[in-house]
């Protein structure tokens, strides 16, 4: 508002892979405010853009992969993992995803990750809740995700320095 007609949006490209068989994106997510604005633009509308920033892609190695995400960090990590398993069909690397949320109602796409776990024995999905509610009846990991990973995975890992870490959130 203080800038007049200038609207600043921080847009990240974190889409799931394209399904060539159906010709659609594997998303199923309705557009939000930023996407709605972008899709409302008409030819000739002026926009100012900057970026992209960062370098967040899957490295072509055989090393173990450890994904660590929390909150909105789910989106780019989910995209990575769907590409890794649904497109590349990765079976030769150990892949672990540790997701942190406050309570059970903030866990997204759990079914997607459990399906990957079922199909790919080299993938494990773990969840930790930092503030589980009584009605969650939570029996899983409790605490902030970084501490849970340290205490329940990295502390006894034979070579944590050899892992590729992918973090967002």
Predicted regions and their residues:
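Short, Lys/Arg- and Gly-enriched loop/turn segments at beta-strand edges
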Residues: 20, 54-62
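Short helix-loop-beta connector
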Residues: 59-64, 158-161
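Ferredoxin-reductase
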Residues: 1-43, 101-103, 128-132
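Conserved beta-strand elements of the Class I
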Residues: 64-68, 164-166
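Histidine-anchored nucleotide/phosphate-binding helix
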Residues: 76-88
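A short acidic Gly-Thr/Ser loop motif
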Residues: 70-71, 169
């Amino acid at each position: 508002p203080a800038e007049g007609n200038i609207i600043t949006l921080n847009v990240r490209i974190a889409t799931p892979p394209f399904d060539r068989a159906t010709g659609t994106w594997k998303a199923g997510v309705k557009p939000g405010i930023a996407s709605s604005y972008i899709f409302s633009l008409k030819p000739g509308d002026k926009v100012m853009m900057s970026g992209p920033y960062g370098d967040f892609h899957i490295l072509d190695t055989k090393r173990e992969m450890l994904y660590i995400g929390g909150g909105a960090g789910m989106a780019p990590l989910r995209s990575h993992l769907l590409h890794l398993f649904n497109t590349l069909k990765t079976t030769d690397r150990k892949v672990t995803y540790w997701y942190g949320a406050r309570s059970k109602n903030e866990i997204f796409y759990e079914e997607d990750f459990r399906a990957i776990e079922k199909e790919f024995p080299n993938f494990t999905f773990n969840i930790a809740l930092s503030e589980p509610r009584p009605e969650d009846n939570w029996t899983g990991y409790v605490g902030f995700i970084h501490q849970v990973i340290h205490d329940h995975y990295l502390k006894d890992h034979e070579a944590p320095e050899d892992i590729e870490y992918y973090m967002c959130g």
